[in-house]
A protein has these predicted regions:
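Edge beta-strand at a domain terminus
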Residues: 134-158
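Contiguous, well-ordered beta-strand patches that form the walls/edges
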Residues: 71-112
Length: 158
């Protein structure tokens, strides 16, 4: 009986300690205080499948930009405005980054990750990933998944 009590007490202390440590670590993330970001991605990679084999191409010609505002890391929300207008997104603050996830009813998933920089920095490294697939087959054409990843920087708004 004593061993069961010790085990329960140990588990409770471990869970409480993990919860406190987690809260403290994200509180120290400077991205927790940012309410808006302007992001620019000058480099991107496209993934394709040719004859069933994965292939990638890296390109630098296209400039892709987006704005993220109404960021609330406590409620886990934000708004991304890019080429298709404003979209409500899920925001997830971690120890070393801030993720924004956009999901559509058609199955598209876009994820933007902003990485922590030095204390006091206003510019942050960022990656924007797009994942889309609409299965379709018509004579002479079969659709393939559309995936890409953009690399660039985000600057904190004022």
């Amino acid at each position: 009986m004593m061993n069961i009590r010790v085990g329960i007490l140990t588990a409770a202390v471990a869970l409480l300690g993990a919860r406190v440590a987690s809260a403290q670590s994200t509180d120290k993330n400077p991205l927790a205080l940012i309410k808006s970001l302007k992001c620019s991605f000058p480099v991107y990679a496209i993934g394709t499948w040719k004859n069933g084999e994965p292939a990638a191409q890296i390109k630098q010609a296209e400039q892709f930009s987006l704005t993220i505002d109404e960021i609330d890391t406590d409620s886990g929300s934000g708004r991304v405005t890019g080429t298709s207008g404003p979209v409500e997104v899920t925001a997830l603050l971690t120890v070393s980054s801030l993720h924004f996830m956009e999901r559509s009813v058609t199955g598209t998933l876009n994820v933007t990750t902003v990485f922590v920089s030095e204390a006091g920095a206003r510019k942050f490294r960022a990656v924007h990933s797009r994942h889309d697939y609409l299965p379709m087959s018509i004579p002479g054409f079969t659709s393939e998944p559309s995936v890409s990843q953009n690399y660039g920087m985000c600057e904190a708004g004022t």
